[in-house]
Amino acid sequence: MKKFFALLFCGFFLFAGNVLAQEADADKVKLGDDMPSITLKSESYGDVTPESLKGKVVLVSLFATWCGPCQLELAEVQKSLWPAYKDNPDFKLLVVGREHTEAELKKYNERKKFSFPLYADPGRKVYSLFADQTIPRAYLFGKDGKLVYSSVGYSKDEFRKLMDAIENGLK
C-alpha cells in the first residue's frame, strides 16, 4: 500500500510539473493582442522603434544560431518570404537572435549569407516580451498592431499558413 501511495504521489508531481511547463511555454502574446513595444539597436541595419513599425505588417521571428528547426525556418525565409516581401513598404521583417550579440550574428551571417536583417537580443529583452522558452517562434502583426498569427517550431505547413497570413495582412 505504501508503494501505491508513493507511486501516486510521484505521478501527481510529474503531471503537475508537466502542466506547469506547458503553461510556462505558453505565448505571452495572444491572437488579437497589441504588439509589445519593441526597440532594437543595430549598427548594421539601423534601429527599430515602435514608431517605425506603425501601420506596417510586422513579422517577428525569434531564433538562435544553434537551433536546428530555426535554421530550417530561416532558410525558407531566405528562399521564399524575403524575396516576396522585402520591397514592400508596408511589411517589416524582424529576425531576432535570442541571446546573441550583433557581433555573433554578423559572424553567423558570414556563413549563412542571409540577405535579410538579423537583430541581436543578447539579454532576451525582446524575446521575454513574447515567451519564456522554445524557439523558433513567429508572430505576425497586422497594420493595426494586433497579433493575427503565431507559431512555435517549424513545419512547411505552418510556414505556408504564415505566408498566407502575410498576404492577407497586406491586402
Regions found by a protein language model. Give the residues of each.
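Short, internal strand/loop/helix patches
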Residues: 94, 109-143
